[in-house]
Amino acid sequence: MERAPEDAGPQREPYNEWALELLEELKNEAVRHFPRIWLHGLGQHIYNTYGDTWEGVEAIIRILQQLLFIHYRIGCQHSRIGITPQRRRNGASRS
């Protein structure tokens, strides 16, 4: 008869602690790149939509991750991740 595998792996941090730590890190990074009034408006929108729930925490984490990714990708001056056209000495371009 089949049995569920025993939990032999290392103990994981509880999801809610991990989510709150991640949210704190994202907030700290977001205030370096976006106006506080925008972030406050986003927080108000999430609160008005989801209230004080884990669904709201997950939503704001997802939105902040997307905003920061796009911000870095389009060329944040604080980051090396952005798209920066590279100069070629011979003018050749890769396709």
Curated annotation (Swiss-Prot):
Keyword Protein transport: no
Posttranslational mods: Phosphorylated on several residues by host. These phosphorylations regulate VPR activity for the nuclear import of the HIV-1 pre-integration complex.
GO biological process: DNA-templated transcription; monoatomic ion transmembrane transport; protein homooligomerization; regulation of DNA-templated transcription; symbiont entry into host cell; symbiont-mediated activation of host apoptosis; symbiont-mediated arrest of host cell cycle during G2/M transition; viral penetration into host nucleus
Keyword S-adenosyl-L-methionine: no
Subcellular location: Virion; Host nucleus; Host extracellular space
Record text on subunit structure and interactions: Homooligomer, may form homodimer. Interacts with p6-gag region of the Pr55 Gag precursor protein through a (Leu-X-X)4 motif near the C-terminus of the P6gag protein. Interacts with host UNG. May interact with host RAD23A/HHR23A. Interacts with host VPRBP/DCAF1, leading to hijack the CUL4A-RBX1-DDB1-DCAF1/VPRBP complex, mediating ubiquitination of host proteins such as TERT and ZGPAT and arrest of the cell cycle in G2 phase.
Record protein name field: Protein Vpr
Organism: Human immunodeficiency virus type 1 group N (isolate YBF106)
Name of the gene this protein is made from: vpr
